[in-house]
Amino acid sequence: MAAPRGPRALSAAAPGSGKPKLTHPGKAILAGGLAGGIEICITFPTEYVKTQLQLDERANPPRYRGIGDCVRQTVRSHGVLGLYRGLSSLLYGSIPKAAVRFGMFEFLSNHMRDAQGRLDSRRGLLCGLGAGVAEAVVVVCPMETIKVKFIHDQTSSNPKYRGFFHGVREIIREQGLKGTYQGLTATVLKQGSNQAIRFFVMTSLRNWYQGDNHNKPMNPLITGVFGATAGAASVFGNTPLDVIKTRMQGLEAHKYRNTLDCGLKILKNEGPKAFYKGTVPRLGRVCLDVAIVFIIYDEVVKLLNKVWKTD
């Protein structure tokens, strides 16, 4: 009789078996990358508006009166495609970001499941935290820094970046590799807390829905609702860190000595409400993007389970 295998990581499963059907981390990397790429193409306009509002500091004075005004001015000046300016830099980062996130989550959960192969909420939070830190260091910080610099540059009176690769070359030439890692501390805090909250909520809701039947099928609609709920929780939990991260990665990042100094200056000069600028567009984008990512991820894993046998 074959010896029992050690636990791997959670995936969409076929009903009827005792323990949950588990996913190989390699499948998680492929499914996560595909989900991340599709999601960002759908949701980028709300990300663009959110970033514009956060960069629109009161002292300038403000250029936009709100979300609708930001959209109207952008479309009037640059057409509908203006809402997709900076997409390339974010798309290049979104695919590896989701791949690293899900791959690391599944890898960590290999070692944190109980004897029944179940991942409880607390361990889901810890795995999510590890996944968030990994994606922040490997992908998010450099790509988000480039994205914010691109959007900020293209809304200036004299844009200097002619394209993604030209912009990256100029940033590295002028500031070195350090120029792509501005706001690392804020990014690690933001992504770590983001994924900790999301995977905690998602794991809790999955466990509640499936009850004692670990292999109860998850309908894509249910997965989407759970994902949107997890996304909303993460928005209210860490929007202040997102605001600080955006300021630290903008073209005026030199105004701040470090993450703490940035937070204190925002509080002193603009008040507590400034930490929640861009919350409404971010809430819509995050709920949609987390729902989309989890739906696509689960469905791709189901497909991979049919063609890639890892048990």
Swiss-Prot record:
Chief place of localization: mitochondrion
Source organism, top-level taxon: Eukaryota
Propeptide: 1-13
Classification via InterPro entries: Mit_carrier, Mitochondrial_sb/sol_carrier, Mt_carrier_dom_sf, TXTP-like
Segments crossing the lipid bilayer: 29-46, 86-105, 129-143, 183-202, 224-241, 278-297
GO CC terms: mitochondrial inner membrane; mitochondrion
Coiled-coil regions listed in the entry: none
GO terms classed as biological process: mitochondrial citrate transmembrane transport
Catalytic reaction(s) noted: (S)-malate(in) + citrate(out) = (S)-malate(out) + citrate(in); D-threo-isocitrate(in) + citrate(out) = D-threo-isocitrate(out) + citrate(in); citrate(out) + succinate(in) = citrate(in) + succinate(out); cis-aconitate(in) + citrate(out) = cis-aconitate(out) + citrate(in)
Keyword annotations of the record: Antiport, Membrane, Mitochondrion, Mitochondrion inner membrane, Phosphoprotein, Repeat, Transit peptide, Transmembrane, Transmembrane helix, Transport
Keyword Phosphoprotein: yes
Chain intervals for the UniProt region annotation (Disordered): 1-21
One term of GO molecular function: antiporter activity
Tissue specificity remark: Expressed minimally but ubiquitously throughout the adult brain. Detected at higher levels in the olfactory bulb, neocortex and cerebellum. Also expressed in a subset of large cells in the globus pallidus.
Phosphoserine: modified positions: S156
Family recorded in the similarity comment: Belongs to the mitochondrial carrier (TC 2.A.29) family.
Function noted in UniProt: Mitochondrial electroneutral antiporter that exports citrate from the mitochondria into the cytosol in exchange for malate. Also able to mediate the exchange of citrate for isocitrate, phosphoenolpyruvate, cis-aconitate and to a lesser extent trans-aconitate, maleate and succinate. In the cytoplasm, citrate plays important roles in fatty acid and sterol synthesis, regulation of glycolysis, protein acetylation, and other physiopathological processes.
Name under which the protein is recorded: Tricarboxylate transport protein, mitochondrial
